[in-house]
């Protein structure tokens, strides 16, 4: 476990509340949650299924709007921003890793990792160099030109992790990023993920059920009664 970063704020949640309607009932998944993640800090989110981990990550990544409270990305409040600006923040500052890869089937592994860079205006040459480097770090140098349908489930997930890191995001949000990998592969891939995040000075909030993986991060939080608390 590393010393907690004292860098600038990468993500801050203030009074974050999320309610859903279920028939005649209103379910409050998050209830005034408070949290701060600083640049260079990697935090594990460990909590049972159904407690709101995925909802929290969607709110933090500006994929959903809270019922109340505010999300700050790099000290910029997201409330009141247009959809266009929120999309630009997600594209330029945030990387997402989901448990299921969501790769584009008509593009090769290398092209899938290049694509977010090209959308952000990176030259094709630099985008390809970055994609080849990241895929190589995750053991996929021999799979650069393979379509997702020709990759194993583990290879698809590693490609998705490389894609999430492609634009050197300042904030990485990951939901069980190695949950579909075997134990040996998960250990290697997670170690490489941590190395890339630390080398590039990013901040990361990573949901995991794996206590051993959580112990390799700077600190661990959990969800209790709709609030984020130390684990």
Swiss-Prot record:
The gene is lolD. Part of the ABC transporter complex LolCDE involved in the translocation of mature outer membrane-directed lipoproteins, from the inner membrane to the periplasmic chaperone, LolA. Responsible for the formation of the LolA-lipoprotein complex in an ATP-dependent manner. Its EC number is 7.6.2.-. Residues 11-231 form the ABC transporter domain. This is Lipoprotein-releasing system ATP-binding protein LolD. SUPFAM superfamilies: P-loop containing nucleoside triphosphate hydrolases. It comes from Gluconobacter oxydans (strain 621H) (Gluconobacter suboxydans). The keyword Metal-binding does not apply. The complex is composed of two ATP-binding proteins (LolD) and two transmembrane proteins (LolC and LolE). Belongs to the ABC transporter superfamily. Lipoprotein translocase (TC 3.A.1.125) family. Keywords: ATP-binding, Cell inner membrane, Cell membrane, Membrane, Nucleotide-binding, Translocase, Transport. ATP binds at residues 47-54.
């Amino acid at each position: 476990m590393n010393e907690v970063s004292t860098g600038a704020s990468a993500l801050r949640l203030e009074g974050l509340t999320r309610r859903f309607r279920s028939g005649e009932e209103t379910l409050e998944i998050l209830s005034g949650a408070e949290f701060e993640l600083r640049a260079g800090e990697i935090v594990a989110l460990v909590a049972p299924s159904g407690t709101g981990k995925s909802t929290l990550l969607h709110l933090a990544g500006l994929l959903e709007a809270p019922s109340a409270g505010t999300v700050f990305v790099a000290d910029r409040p997201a409330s009141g921003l247009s959809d266009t600006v929120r999309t630009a923040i997600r594209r330029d500052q945030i990387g997402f890793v989901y448990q299921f890869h969501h790769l584009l089937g008509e593009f090769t592994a290398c092209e899938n990792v290049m694509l977010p860079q090209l959308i952000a205006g990176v030259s094709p040459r630099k985008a390809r160099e970055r994609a080849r480097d990241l895929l190589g770090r995750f053991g996929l140098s021999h799979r650069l030109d393979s379509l997702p349908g020709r990759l194993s489930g583990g290879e698809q997930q590693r490609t998705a992790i490389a894609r999430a890191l492609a634009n050197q995001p300042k904030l990485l949000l990951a939901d069980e990023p190695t949950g579909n990998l075997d134990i040996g592969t998960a250990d290697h891939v997670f170690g490489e993920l941590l190395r890339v995040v630390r080398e590039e000075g990013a901040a990361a909030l990573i949901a995991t059920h794996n206590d051993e993986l959580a112990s390799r991060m700077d600190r661990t939080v959990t969800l209790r009664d709709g609030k984020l608390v130390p684990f």
